[in-house]
Amino acid sequence: MNPDAAAEIIAGAAASNPDAAMELVQDIMASDPSSAAEFAASMAEANPAAAALATEAIIEAAPEQAIEATAAMAEVAPAAAGAAAEVMAELAPDQAGEAAMAMQEAAPEAAAAIAGGVAQGNPEVAAEVATEMAAADPEAAADIATGVAVAAQVNAAQEVAAAQVEAQAQVADATADLQ
């Protein structure tokens, strides 16, 4: 089967059955790690929403190809860069900075999404990565800062929502104890 056709089929299937798609991608990448970047780029080009799945599969099956693959995805599908950066920061924080820099070089227009993705995936490495990105491209510094700020707002909103759920559960327990 043509690798581009396989990538397109799997990228399309990722929305309906992500677990099966993940297994297929991991098997393909493990069988030929040298083609992982090309395969991931084909997936992202076919469906940018599949970038997170492709990135996770690469980290699991061919981690040495992860930086090259995320850059390749960003180059062909800049809309995929944020999701790829988020997964890299979450699952491979030691490689997050290098991957973000490679993605930024491949798709400078995605700098905000890349920085935001890193901040979403791992807030602990976000400042360091954003600083490296801004130093590499000072003209993108405002976009990079915006990406991190938006991600921080999302992270804070998620923490508030989780706290509200916990508080409601405690109120329900206390109310039940009183009755």
Stretches with model-predicted labels:
Residues 1-179:
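General marker for long, soluble alpha-helical cores
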